[in-house]
Amino acid sequence: NSNFILARVPLRRFEDLDTSSLNSIEVISSDSEELEEAILSIIDSIRHDHPTVHPGDIAVVFLEGSKANYALADSLAVRIYEKYSWKAIKGYETKDSTSDAVFISNRNNIKGLEFPFVIGLVRGQITDNVFSRNTIYMMLTRSFITSYFLVNNMDANAEFIKKYTIAAKSISDSGIMILREPPEAEKSQQNQKVSIAVAQEQRPLKEVIEE
């Protein structure tokens, strides 16, 4: 089978910023009980590496709409203020992002927005569901400097974390990602999965593709 080579042109949003030395995607795994601390650790790293960063340069986006994630958002907003004296706003409560507040959101309120740094959080198991994968892609493409992909390190995610870590390193090192072209039987199976997922969501396929 042949391979697909996906390439990207590095974005230069700031003339004085050399993005060649920055990782465009970093994959980080954490225990579910330590996700909040992991997010704060990432913010610490951003502040250390970019001393002029503003609160509004950072977005935290969670994949699942679970009670645990909304509770995390509430707690995180308090911790951010206590630790950095920064405000935080929640995208599902207000549509306005601002330069003086960290933007915390679920997946439904991030489309069309861009930030220098995005922390994407997946608390549960990552499946091959087309909508889940599509949302992960959307989260990771909201940043124009670095996306931090924070994943629960449960055993069920081990293979996914391994593959994404390798892919992220390839993108950061060379700007390309090499993908195996699946055989026809696998393509057919994937098409069936997409069709079933779309039917269950009762949404047009075109809408899913353009999401």
Where are these predicted regions, by residue range?
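The feature marks helicase ATPase cores and/or their adjacent C-terminal helical subdomains
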Residues: N1-E211
